[in-house]
Swiss-Prot record:
Name recorded for this polypeptide: Small ribosomal subunit protein bS18
Keywords of the record: Ribonucleoprotein, Ribosomal protein, RNA-binding, rRNA-binding
InterPro entries linked to this entry: Ribosomal_bS18, Ribosomal_bS18_CS, Ribosomal_bS18_sf
Its job: Binds as a heterodimer with protein bS6 to the central domain of the 16S rRNA, where it helps stabilize the platform of the 30S subunit.
């Protein structure tokens, strides 16, 4: 077999390259609004207790469709999010809160 060598064009320095636009979208660039750091309400208020028998508190951590709100949205710390999840599951098991709030027709 004969070995062929391919000749690559020389790379240009970065300063010689044409500048690319930083934003490659179609419309104007949108800035994200400033979002405050979410604080776990259970860490902030030590008197507030997670109890599976209190559906009023648990409903604020459930969506309209009956799903548990994730930690990044609710702002809970991991310890309290686990406790809330466990309390919601217990309350669902004994029918204090519905598993799905309404029947969803696809």
């Amino acid at each position: 077999m004969s070995e062929e060598t391919t000749v690559r064009p020389e790379r240009t320095e970065r300063s010689e390259r044409p500048e690319r636009p930083q934003y490659r979208g179609n419309g104007p660039r949108k800035r994200r609004p400033f979002q405050r750091r979410k604080v776990c309400r259970f860490c902030a208020d030590k008197d507030l207790v997670i109890d599976y028998k209190d559906p009023r508190v648990l409903r604020s951590f459930i969506t309209e469709r009956g799903k548990i709100v994730p930690r990044r949205i609710s702002g809970n710390c991991s310890k309290h999010q686990r406790e809330i999840t466990e309390a919601i599951k217990r309350a669902r098991n004994i029918a204090l809160i519905p598993i799905a709030s309404t029947h969803v027709v696809a």
